Amino acid sequence: MKLLFITDPLESFKIYKDTTFAMMREAQRRGHTLAVCLPQDLVWQRGSQVTARVQDIVLTGDSTNWFQAQPLRSAALTAFDAVLMRKDPPFDSEYFYATHLLEQAEREGARVFNKPRALRDHPEKLAIMEFPQFIGPTLVTRDPQDIQRFHAEHEDIILKPLDGMGGMGIFRVGPDGLNLGSITETLNRHGAQSVMVQKFLPEITEGDKRVL
């Protein structure tokens, strides 16, 4: 099959832990061909289909120079057997617009994974609300007092931004509450943004659950 991955720049990948890289490696091992593009490479024009400026790539197996890329070319998304949207957060306006272009490509016959509407309706952090049986005590709020009460109840907590990924912007606050106020102000931008707060679970060192 011909697969198109919509990703961040390949040069930014940390291949020792990147899920998209693992998917590419397994796809190539199974004999599928790979192409990549960035979300900003998506194009639509009246009277035409959604296209993208794509590069065909081959994984080399080398840990440093891990891919070889062909020159950019224009291709309709319907020319691929599957299009995989793998752009990392944040879920900003450009990400939102990209999902609409991908939804148009679906109407034209492209097979897009995950479904663009699902990406809009299920932000990565908040999707866990649909699976409460798999999560520990969790709070989503922008109110510092809510966070203080949650800390008083659970003592050892984790605070994280809703639009982060890869461990960025995550803080742990222990029973002493050291810097809880300043961390809250940093993450919620003085009350302008909601944050997620969770009880710290030592079992996290044994792994987590992924819902696919």
Model regions and ranges:
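Extended hydrophobic/aromatic-rich secondary-structure runs
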Residues: 13, 26-33, 152, 158, ...
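Conserved N-proximal alpha/beta basic substrate-recognition cap immediately N-terminal to
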Residues: 11-140, 146
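N-terminal cationic-hydrophobic initiation segments that often serve targeting/anchoring roles
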Residues: 28, 106, 151, 187-188
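Extreme N-terminal starter segment of soluble prokaryotic enzymes
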Residues: 1-4
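Phosphate-binding site of ATP-dependent enzymes
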Residues: 20, 145, 152-156, 163-212
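Extended, domain-scale alpha-helical bundle/helix-rich regions
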Residues: 7-8
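Short acidic, glycine-rich loop/turn motifs
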Residues: 61, 161-163
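Structural detector of well-ordered beta-strand residues that form the stable sheet scaffold
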Residues: 35, 112-113, 158, 196-198
